Amino acid sequence: MKRILTTIAAIVLCASASFSQPKRILQTFTMPDSLKQGVCAVIRLDSTATECHSLKSMTTGHMLVVTVLNSEGADYGHFIEYTSEGSSLRQLKGTLYDASGEKRRTVGKGDLISTEQSAEMADDYTTHYLELTSPTYPYTICWEWEVTHSDGYISIPPFAPAHYVGVSLERGVYTLTTPKDYKFSFKGANTSIEPQVSLQKEKKVSKWVMEGILPYRKDAFMPHPQSILPHILFTPDEFIYHKTSGKASSWEEYGKWQWALLQGRDSLSQEQKDLVHSITDTIPLRREKIKALYRHLGQSTRYVSIQLGLGGLQPMAAHKVLSYGIGDCKGLSNCLKAMLKECGIESNYVEVNTNNPAIHPDLASASQTNHVILKVPDPAGDLWLECTNTSYPPGYIHSNIAGHHALVYANGTAAIEKIPSYPDTMNRIISKVHIRIDQAGHSYIKVEEKYVNRCAEPFLGMATLGIREQKPLIQGMLSIPSCTIDSISIKEIATQVPTVELSYTCSSPNWVQANANRLFIPTTIFNQASAKFNRTRKLDIEIPYGYVWENAMTIDLADDYTIEAKAGDISITCCAGSLTHTTSLQGRTILAKTERSILSGRNPKEKVGEIKGFFGAAAGLWGKKIILKRQ
């Protein structure tokens, strides 16, 4: 389910009310030096003025002034806006200024590229896009535009002017004007600013200001932006949307409205009901019935995104999903819910955000979720079903939802629950590598790997590809020059969590370097990503997920050698994980064993030295070679 795009904005009615010196804000040399250091662009002004005229009508004006310092910042000067049924882009003006603040070019609404075409099959959103650039840097662009909603709205645009990396903010202003008796709620995250509130005739005006916000330098294992960036969310306590009305004063009230949208959407034709019973009536176990219907859903339907009808919030009726053989996350989840209900199994419609793990418990807004799954309560353990991708085993909690908060619908409303996540030790890679090196130094390699749980997710569906598509994927995993892949075998194993077995053979004439008396052998055949930390750590260290990697490498040699040099045996443990490595020579066979475990979680920035040392030790290991001397 697409995030509701009721946002984005319009012309500020009076530019002088937003900043007192328009010329200054357009000149590059007037920027504080602190805002220019290490960035590609500076938001000089991000001013939003939203007026809720009534529950059906809202106008949002926006003025965005961006100084682009170099080519990396050019994208931040482009204009993009989305509208949908019930909203429209009314005005647009873009002006380009040189470094001294002199006007060089003006564009308007007639220059826009507006398209309703998208990758989705059914979508009533329109994308409006326009690029405005200069061949010389720096330059400044001022955009002014207006979006109106005339048939109700469910969200009020947020105030989120700050960027995580690369872009600093000089000044952000947000003004919300409402009738005196209009009720709304707001939630500030990562900020303590309070609004300035005034009464102007019959209207209430609330104003928020953010100033001088510097971005962070890109660093390893940065926390999720939503947990760091200051932003404010808004929602109307009551709303009218697509000819329906509801309340958003709490999740319980919002849940009642969404629950009403689900009623009557679980209908099945008699033929479809008969099919459900033909699949399940001979299956004695409840869980096996669920698995059978889950598999049937995947075999008989395919996923498409559908953003029509009530802004994409109401699912397609279950009988239509089965008849047409298509559905989005809402429709497919609701369809499986209907089939389960037909055979006496109750389930819950669930909304979750695949990008942001958190849902604010004290602010109910549709924009906080963007996806729908299904929950089947069970005494033996609840099943969470991803209906858009049945290549996942039934009940498997994939990485885009594991540990996220979700809205679970039951008994006429909704409540927040946290979706479980798996322990790090369940995410595993087990690798066995056998290498034969001939007298000319050519390497012949056989690899057998097993990927389990989260580590298997990137490989699901790979078995359906042709070998021509599989080869570059495998080569991208390897650090082997002049690698020729000879054979590939991929198997997806039917277990409770994703399990993929991958084996292949390859060869290389120069993976090993050789001279008359010595061989220089890398410590690993695999590409190993290194964590690059800044010299000074500003934020806590957040490792998104953990895993265990076990690797055993056996190398058969053509002649007798002795080990002249190698990476020392390693055994390291820290708050971020552990690493052990040993290398030995037995006759003409080298045995190298490595086990690395990474622990997910958030560590205080004061631990950066310990964690940096841990990842640095691993990087140092991969960079070393085993040096053998011919006897």
Predicted segments, located by residue:
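Surface-exposed, acidic/Ser/Thr-rich flexible loop segments
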Residues: Y76, E81, Y125, S134-A189, ...
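Secretory-pathway-linked proteins and extracytosolic
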Residues: P22-T28, T148-A160, Y164-L308, D424, ...
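Early extracytoplasmic/domain-onset interaction patches
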Residues: Q21-Y82, S421-E449, S482, D486, ...
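Hydrophobic/aromatic-rich core segments of domains that either
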Residues: G331-S421
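Long hydrophobic segments that form regular secondary structure
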Residues: N411-W511
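Cysteine-centered nucleophilic/redox motifs
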Residues: L64, Y139-I141, Y174, L293, ...
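A surface-exposed beta-strand-loop module
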Residues: L92-A162, S192-L229, K432-R436, T484-R518
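Solvent-exposed beta-hairpin/edge-strand motifs
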Residues: R24, I80-G110, S168-S185, G461-S487, ...
